[in-house]
């Protein structure tokens, strides 16, 4: 049996998730002076096939009503990236304006990821 993690996002949540993914990826690549996947640390992960699969899944989800379907290792990458992003970007819960909206969206996204992690869909291999 294989675990599949399914997450449904609103358009606004998915846009926020994609924006975070793009900024994290660009910051990672900028530190390495280029688009080289090998031997690059991506928020603690090697730039490997799981990161590439997450990249592909993000593209597919945009075409599939903002729904992600991830296997365990790819799900782990997404969850780790989002937790680290939240930790590295100090959000003041009393803030107002655009920062407040991102703070709320990041919390919603992390809740959906966490909930999905508790209820994987089991599929035959």
Task: Go through the PLM ranges and name each one.
Residues 1-125:
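Positively charged, low-complexity terminal tracts
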